[in-house]
């Protein structure tokens, strides 16, 4: 769930629709919390590795806000989230709160990577077969490299999508999705299970 959606008046309705989608893990973007990290780095000059850890905590802050706002469950770190998924019979969405102290993220620690690639990493980590990117802008193309150039996804994402080629990827402009639940359920249709990232579906 893109961080820029934090400023969207559609966010409450978006969360309401997500609540009806079973077996859903929500990966929050950094939103305004990550913007604060960028400003702090510019003012104080700390390195990108520190900024990366702080940006992960910014994602966790936005995620905690979403969980509180929508009444969703939340889990700190990928390991706890995976354990919660394994033991829980509940179908309500679960929000991942990234934890730089425990998440062994096999990714570059820089601003070149955002919640997009982290969501793809988590999908691989928990054995998910589909990833849906909820954005606050139109998705003009299905080409991941073009989306990265347009800064709709981060610049690491196209390469990661090739690495995790078994995970189907969809992109939705959530600000104009009047029937988001139906569109999400369409993403999870069995007939689309083998869609490859290079054939990203756009809604």
Q: What annotation goes with each model-predicted range?
A:
Residues 1-188, 196-203:
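Nucleotide/pyrophosphate-binding catalytic subdomain
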């Amino acid at each position: 769930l893109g961080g820029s959606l934090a400023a969207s008046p559609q966010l409450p309705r978006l969360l309401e629709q997500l609540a009806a989608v079973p077996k859903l893990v929500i990966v929050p973007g950094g939103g305004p919390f990550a913007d604060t990290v960028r400003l702090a780095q510019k003012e104080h000059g700390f390195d990108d590795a520190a900024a990366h850890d702080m940006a992960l905590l910014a994602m966790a802050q936005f995620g905690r806000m979403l969980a509180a706002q929508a009444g969703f469950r939340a889990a700190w770190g990928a390991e706890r989230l995976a354990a919660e998924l394994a033991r829980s019979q509940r179908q309500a969405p679960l929000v991942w709160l990234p934890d730089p102290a425990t998440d062994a993220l096999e990714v570059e620690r820089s601003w070149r990577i955002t919640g997009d690639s982290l969501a793809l990493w988590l999908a691989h980590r928990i054995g998910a077969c589909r990833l849906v990117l909820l954005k606050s802008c139109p998705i003009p193309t299905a080409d991941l490299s073009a989306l990265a150039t347009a800064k709709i996804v981060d610049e690491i994402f196209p390469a990661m999508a090739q690495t995790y080629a078994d995970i189907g990827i969809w992109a939705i402009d959530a600000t104009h999705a009047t029937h988001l639940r139906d569109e999400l359920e369409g993403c999870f249709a069995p007939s689309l299970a083998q869609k490859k990232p290079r054939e990203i579906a756009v809604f």
